[in-house]
């Protein structure tokens, strides 16, 4: 009897241990599920097979058909930089526009000319050694960031303002600003308006989906003026409305207003740009987030135009610097520089050819040449877009 009782006690104890073990496993599993951070969606799923209790293998591969919840602006690693793709394809797909005088216009002959168009060429010259290896893609204002995010274009060079939201939520990475602008207002010369404060109870027309729209409303509120801010899809529609008397004033970046004024049907003298500038509009190229290699390549391509002007190097004299003894210029042009271990060409690891700056200057020009060709004829002055040494704010980091 005692033996049977002992056996029964041992059996009960064994069952208790098994139950405790099972309970412990469940609690541990619950704790693990609660404290393990969610898997980063940017990382590939673990494809290793787990072993089931019956000895078979269970496939733990994540469902690859699940929707991608990556938010705009969140970095997505694809494993290949746009720089590699551009160099493989031999062309830069540059998002721009074809109807903004001074910046980007498609001529009847099919040529893209203008300040922005030339900076597309600057990028191609730096990356590919061929300034004409550009596919110009005309993108609408409302679609420009979608085109950038979808991969339809490699870079956006379309008089686009660098803002916090575009840098964040829109998923763009802005590089070196190539034109510092500000918002202004243009009116008919015979309107009687001489200053922004004269504009009360008027209709101010802007392009929708731009910084201009919000800035105009904010400026009216700041000055206590009654403005009806009317938004149109593109500047061409504003011009039509302006000509039809549906707009009392036209607000945009001063550079854009200057461009449209230069081609206005009744002549530039029929329009006046009021003197006040009421916003900051840093314009420059943008690339997709998450690709630092491509961003730095585009960044240094733009900087090369600024540094070349500072060195006094332009498309007409670049060859004369072949024999320069200035090590800073030697490094910049991809020439050999004497060092402790002999002569060597600087390769800073940008993923660009060592002579990229020389290609930019030879094939397109320095910043001053690009500005003088496209923006000076509109009546725009360098102003703050002059070199830092000439009273402006353009400045290139040391190339070393």
Predicted regions and their residues:
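Acidic, polar ligand-binding/catalytic clefts
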Residues: 121, 125, 129, 133-198, ...
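Extended ligand-binding regions for polar small-molecule ligands
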Residues: 72-77, 121, 125, 189-193, ...
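Bilobed "Venus flytrap"/periplasmic-binding protein-like clamshell domains
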Residues: 93-102, 112-127, 161-163, 181-240, ...
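Bacterial lipoprotein signal-peptidase II cleavage site
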Residues: 23-32
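Immediate post-signal peptide segment of exported/extracytoplasmic ligand-binding proteins
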Residues: 44-45, 57, 61-109, 192-203
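Short helix-initiation/N-cap motifs at beta->coil->alpha
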Residues: 79-80, 134-146, 191, 229-244
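C-terminal motif of bacterial Sec signal peptides marking the signal peptidase cleavage site
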Residues: 18-21
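Extracytoplasmic small-molecule ligand-binding "clamshell" domains
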Residues: 76-156, 348, 352, 367, ...
């Amino acid at each position: 009897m005692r033996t049977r009782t002992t056996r029964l006690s041992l059996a009960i104890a064994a069952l208790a241990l098994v139950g405790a073990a099972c309970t412990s496993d469940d609690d541990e599993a619950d704790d693990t599920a609660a404290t393990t951070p969610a898997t980063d969606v940017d990382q590939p799923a673990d494809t290793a097979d787990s072993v089931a209790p019956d000895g078979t293998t269970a496939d733990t591969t994540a469902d690859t058909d699940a929707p991608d919840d990556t938010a705009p602006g969140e970095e997505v690693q694809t494993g290949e930089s746009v720089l590699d793709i551009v160099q493989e394809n031999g062309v830069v797909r540059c998002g721009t526009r074809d109807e903004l005088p001074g910046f980007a216009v498609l001529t009847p002959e099919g040529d893209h000319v203008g300040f922005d168009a030339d900076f597309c060429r600057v990028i191609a010259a730096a990356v590919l050694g061929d300034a004409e290896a550009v596919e110009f893609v005309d993108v609408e204002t409302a679609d420009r960031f979608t085109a950038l995010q979808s991969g339809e274009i490699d870079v956006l060079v379309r008089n686009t303002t660098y803002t916090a939201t575009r840098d964040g939520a829109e998923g763009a990475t802005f590089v070196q600003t190539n034109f510092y602008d500000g918002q202004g207002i243009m009116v008919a010369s015979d309107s009687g308006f001489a200053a922004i404060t004269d504009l009360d109870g008027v209709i101010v027309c802007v392009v929708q989906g731009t910084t201009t729209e919000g800035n105009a409303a904010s400026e009216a509120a700041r000055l206590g003026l009654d403005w009806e801010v009317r938004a149109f899809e593109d500047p061409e529609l504003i011009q039509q409305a302006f000509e039809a008397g549906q707009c009392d004033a036209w607000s945009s970046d001063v550079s854009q207003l200057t461009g449209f004024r230069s081609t206005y049907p009744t002549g530039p003298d029929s329009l006046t740009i009021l003197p006040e500038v009421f916003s900051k509009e840093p314009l420059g190229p943008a690339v997709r987030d998450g690709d630092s290699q491509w961003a730095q390549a585009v960044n240094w391509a733009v900087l090369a135009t600024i540094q070349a002007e500072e060195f006094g190097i332009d498309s007409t004299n670049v060859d004369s610097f072949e024999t320069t003894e200035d090590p800073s210029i030697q490094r910049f042009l991809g020439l050999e520089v004497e060092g402790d271990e002999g002569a060597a060409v600087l390769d800073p690891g940008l993923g660009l050819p060592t002579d990229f700056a020389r290609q930019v200057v030879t094939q397109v020009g320095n910043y001053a040449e690009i500005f003088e060709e496209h923006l000076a004829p509109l009546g725009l002055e360098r102003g703050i877009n002059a070199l830092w040494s000439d009273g402006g704010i353009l400045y290139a980091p040391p190339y070393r």
